[in-house]
Swiss-Prot record:
Ranges in the topological domain labelled Cytoplasmic: 1-37, 449-512
Glycosylation sites: 365, 392
Gene Ontology CC: dendritic spine; membrane; neuron projection; neuronal cell body; plasma membrane; postsynaptic density membrane; synapse
Motif (GAS motif): 441-443
Effect of residue 392 to S: Reduces N-glycosylation. Abolishes N-glycosylation
Outcome reported for the amino acid change (mutating residue 109 to A): No effect on pH dependence and function
Catalytic activity: Na(+)(in) = Na(+)(out); K(+)(in) = K(+)(out); Li(+)(in) = Li(+)(out)
Protein name: Acid-sensing ion channel 2
Length: 512
């Protein structure tokens, strides 16, 4: 190893790198930078140190790369609760319009929309209709000398939709009687619907402290198939089913029953055992969720269903200058003509468009309800006569129109599903620190030693550079003061046995 001569004493001293290697806590380098000539031992230590450093860099880069891949893991847990908030329950009759409530004015404006009349306001296929229904329709569709009146889609749906007061035969919540006043009217694509436990209008949310049947909502409904519209054509409003559509959801999200609801058939008692799930997703770059606090144009709380309805509303308003009755906002409601000619085709086009137009990301916090359905036939042979007498209906009518819906928590617990970061900064630092200790015996303080050595080295170089500049300036000044004096340097031949700087000073004095 190179040794440098001491400027003051002329002796050999170790270089700065040798001093650092001898005092540093970095393993191995003291065996590389030692006093004396280059040996095989020093070469082997150098190879071992460089190899260990290379392995450290490879492993550390792999850990850094894994960190920036932003992986996540999912944690599932089940939590027992003392009580649970009962979910909102939205139900809709699959028939959106009661035939008996249709008026001549309704048929004049909306007969084509309902597929009851053609473009000429004529019954298209009278041979497909029941004679009694056909006669009633002909009377309602007699437009001879008729003067049409003003028409409102909101008023039409509210008046013609099924009334829960007429549909409901009985209602119980946790064994206590409830009624139509405990339901809130909402409008969906099915028309006039009803929501239980909405929490709106200042009503407190209902809770339950037990699981199992009898501790939730039990309701008996008459779907009134006699009121279903006759079908001899197909439109977006046409339905071939009989029953109700039901959606179980949280109070913070609007119903999207046409896509997320399940059907309940007449002639059966349907049991719905549900379990609450609380999901937590990660935002970018670990996930794709959107904060629930980031509201939308028409909804204060973000959810996927709210985003879908919000997007559809904006699209219809932009293209048709109106909105459907179930859509929020202050734009005017679409007329039946706008419904048929613009709004319904626009929704069809929107469904066919690239999904990026209505890109609805998952909210970061979401509550949903798992469901398990089972059903039994009603009425039984032994109860048929009793129900006939109680509701003054025939057994056939009961089998075709009456259903019972029983919704309850399977158990008084909820499931949490949470996304967590698979690799955080603390884990990254721990892995890199462990590998530093394994491969080169270094720690954070060792890194500080390296920075301190680099700082001292730079400072020394700068001071040497500044010292040389000052020395050159001083030498030039002394030479200028001696220009007028004779040069005696040639006459001096003796040797001065003093340090180099002292000797130079003496020579300059003699020279001057």
């Amino acid at each position: 190893m190179d040794l440098k001569e001491s400027p003051s004493e002329g002796s050999l001293q170790p270089s700065s790198i040798q001093i650092f290697a001898n005092t540093s806590t970095l393993h191995g380098i003291r065996h590389i930078f030692v006093y004396g000539p280059l040996t095989i031992r020093r070469v082997l230590w150098a190879v071992a140190f460089v190899g260990s450093l290379g392995l450290l860099l490879v492993e550390s880069s792999e850990r850094v790369s894994y960190y920036f891949s932003y992986q996540h893991v999912t944690k599932v847990d089940e939590v027992v609760a003392q009580s649970l908030v009962f979910p909102a329950v939205t139900l809709c009759n699959l028939n959106g319009f009661r035939f008996s409530r249709l008026t001549t004015n309704d048929l004049y404006h909306a007969g084509e929309l309902l597929a009851l009349l053609d473009v000429n306001l004529q019954i298209p296929d009278p041979h497909l209709a029941d004679p009694t229904v056909l006669e009633a329709l002909r009377q309602k569709a007699n437009f001879k000398h008729y003067k049409p009146k003003q028409f409102s889609m909101l008023e039409f749906l509210h008046r013609v939709g099924h009334d829960l007061k007429d549909m409901m035969l009985y209602c119980k919540f946790k064994g206590q009687e409830c009624g139509h006043q405990d339901f809130t009217t909402v409008f969906t694509k099915y028309g006039k619907c009803y929501m239980f436990n909405s929490g709106e209008d200042g009503k407190p949310l209902l809770t339950t402290v037990k699981g199992g049947t009898g501790n939730g909502l039990e309701i008996m409904l008459d779907i009134q198939q006699d009121e279903y519209l006759p079908i001899w054509g197909e439109t977006e409003e046409t339905t071939f089913e009989a029953g109700v559509k039901v959606q179980i959801h949280s109070q913070s999200e609007p119903p999207f029953i046409q896509e997320l609801g399940f059907g309940v058939a007449p002639g059966f008692q349907t049991f719905v055992a549900t379990q609450e799930q609380r999901l937590t997703y990660l935002p970018p770059p670990w996930g794709e969720c959107r904060s629930s606090e980031m509201g939308l144009d028409f909804f204060p709380v973000y959810s996927i269903t709210a985003c879908r309805i919000d997007c559809e509303t904006r699209y219809i308003v932009e293209n048709c200058n109106c909105r459907m009755v179930h859509m929020p906002g202050d734009a005017p409601f679409c007329t039946p003509e706008q419904h048929k000619e613009c709004a319904e085709p626009a929704l069809g086009l929107l469904a066919e468009k690239d999904s990026n137009y209505c890109l609805c990301r998952t909210p970061c916090n979401l509550t949903r309800y798992n469901k398990e359905l089972s059903m039994v036939k009603i009425p039984s042979k032994t109860s048929a006569k009793y129900l006939e007498k109680k509701f003054n209906k025939s057994e056939k009518y009961i089998s075709e129109n009456i259903l019972v819906l029983d919704i309850f928590f399977e158990a008084l617990n909820y499931e949490t599903i949470e996304q967590k970061k698979a690799y955080e900064v603390a884990a990254l630092l721990g892995d890199i620190g462990g590998q530093m200790g394994l491969f080169i015996g270094a720690s954070l303080l060792t890194i500080l030693e390296l920075f301190d050595y680099i700082y001292e080295l730079i400072k020394e170089k700068l001071l040497d550079l500044l010292g040389k500049e000052e020395e050159e300036g001083s030498h030039d000044e002394n030479m200028s003061t001696c220009d007028t004096m004779p040069n005696h340097s040639e006459t001096i031949s003796h040797t001065v046995n003093v340090p180099l700087q002292t000797a130079l000073g003496t020579l300059e004095e003699i020279a001057c």
